[in-house]
């Protein structure tokens, strides 16, 4: 451990690997809500946060576990398509609360092109929230529909049926053939859209009002 008069003990949350204060400061300076994406071994969650002196206030949030309980999701809780759908759900809820713009907070995740963090970002963008980003870092449509998993499952089923059963046991137990995953993603997305169709209608109405005023 460092010693001497110039040594500074890092703040507790930085020591615990929870907060990058330098990055947090830059995000707070933007004056916009932060879209935070956090990932565990089983699930992931997306929050839209407002920075306050007493602590962050959650404006809107979504957890991938909700996809299973409320919208019939049968896939994994923390893969790329789950990240996209969770970001989409959180984005609609943010719009419902009046959040039109935000900045992405990746936390201590390493920003990797096409990763789950950016899949969640793509979901929020598709919901209608404006978030500064580069198109290059977003995963493609085929990726967030998990077509790569479906193709791998189809090939594995032909090559090694036993390994296929083990690898995709959770999907199969829930009644989903992994080869049908892209279509299932669309089904769940439509279920989310149906639950929050009033948000899309209100957002469209606001857009028309702005155009008239302009």
UniProtKB/Swiss-Prot annotation:
Alphabetical list of SUPFAM superfamilies matching this protein: Translational machinery components
UniProt keywords, alphabetically: Ribonucleoprotein, Ribosomal protein, RNA-binding, rRNA-binding
Matches recorded under Pfam families: Ribosomal_L5e (PF17144)
GO terms under cellular component: cytosolic large ribosomal subunit
Any one GO molecular-function label of the UniProt entry: 5S rRNA binding
InterPro entries in UniProt: Rbsml_uL18_euk
Signal peptide positions on this chain: none
GO BP term (any one): ribosomal large subunit assembly
Known role: This is one of the proteins that bind and probably mediate the attachment of the 5S RNA into the large ribosomal subunit, where it forms part of the central protuberance.
NCBIfam families membership: PRK08569.1
Assembly behavior: Part of the 50S ribosomal subunit. Contacts the 5S and 23S rRNAs.
Family (UniProt): Belongs to the universal ribosomal protein uL18 family.
Protein name per UniProt: Large ribosomal subunit protein uL18
Gene: rpl18
